[in-house]
Design a protein with these regions (language model features):
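Catalytic-core regions of core metabolic enzymes
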Residues: 1-320
Length: 320
């Protein structure tokens, strides 16, 4: 893995954080890249990704946005298989042309990338491109939840919630502006991943017709899918646009379509956690007939009301 944009003078630079923790804690060969060259922690800093003699599977790009097209071109020329673009300053701040330049360049070369404006990928025991020091983030254990989020902050907070409930993840991916890799691609990947049983999403919005494609793909997926949809109000829609350049659309329509196509919708981050935990243990639905056993009469009443609210049947118990 090449980490492009490291600093030889500023130890807390995001690229340095990514380089250091992967170099020291994960089984990945890591290379530091900066046009000035030099050394970082007694290891050489390459002036370009092209100078690295070893084949590179992944490039983590953490340079100023205006330099990203040139760096992507260098990665393509080197034969790098894909990238995570951490850098912000693209469509989310109004520079759609710069984002399109990167996207077009990558599309012509069939070069996949995550981002821009994202944290990237966390895969337990494999790789971590989040630019947060270990003491500032709680990593859940390895498990069977695949989580995809447009927001890096929501992803980090959700990882804390998963860890608190003892829920493990197979991988967590922050896709940011999703200029290349999108939700449908992640469904494809997680569906074939043997270590994933549940696929969860935090979604702010879609481009034109993208929501329809997501629902169609989710409906055919063989694994349960849970969605936490943001941008439900006028204020939320405006916030989504400035955050990840997303078009939130009509929430009520999308919510109804999700229900029609068996996509579980969580109203809050806490519901998302509970849904993932339940589906990771019981991925296949029941007939809807529920029996309630409770030491507390009051909790039995609450459970009965919840079943009624969600259309679940509680059969009468036979006298014998």
């Amino acid at each position: 893995m090449a980490v492009i944009g490291v600093s030889t003078t500023h130890d807390h630079h995001p690229a340095n954080v990514i380089y250091n923790k992967n170099h020291l804690r994960y089984p990945v060969q890591t290379f530091a890249v900066n046009p000035k060259g030099g050394q970082l922690n007694r290891a050489p800093v390459y002036r370009s990704v092209g100078q690295i003699e070893t084949a590179v599977d992944l490039a983590v790009i953490a340079v100023r946005s205006r330099f990203v097209p040139d760096v992507v071109a260098q990665c393509i020329e080197k034969g790098v298989k894909g990238a995570v673009i951490i850098s912000g300053g693209f469509a989310e701040t109004g520079d759609k042309d710069l984002q399109k330049e990167v996207t077009d360049l990558a599309a012509q070369a069939d070069f996949p990338f995550v981002g821009p404006n994202c944290l990237g990928i966390y895969s337990p025991d494999a790789v971590d491109t989040f630019f947060l020091p270990g003491e500032r983030i709680i990593h859940p254990k390895k498990g069977n939840i695949g989580f995809v989020s447009q927001s890096g902050g929501v992803l980090v907070d959700q990882m804390v919630k998963f860890a608190g409930q003892g829920i493990g993840v197979s991988a967590a991916v922050s896709i940011g502006n999703k200029a290349c890799i999108r939700e449908t691609h992640m469904i494809d990947w997680f569906e074939q991943d043997l270590g994933t049983r549940v696929i969860a999403f935090y979604i702010e919005g879609f481009e034109c017709r993208e929501g329809r494609e997501f629902i169609k793909r989710a409906h055919t997926c063989t694994k349960p899918i849970v969605v936490l949809k943001a941008g439900k109000t006028a204020r939320g829609i405006a916030a989504a646009s400035s955050h990840t350049a997303s078009v939130a659309g009509d929430y009520r329509v999308f919510s109804q379509i999700m229900a029609q196509h068996c996509v579980a919708e969580a109203d809050t981050e806490y519901e998302l956690t509970s849904f993932c935990e339940a589906l990771s243990c019981y991925p296949k639905g029941s007939s809807g007939h529920i029996g309630i056993v409770s030491l507390s009469g009051g909790h039995g009443v609450v459970a009965a009301d919840a079943c009624g609210h969600h259309g679940l049947d509680i059969p009468e118990i036979a006298e014998q």
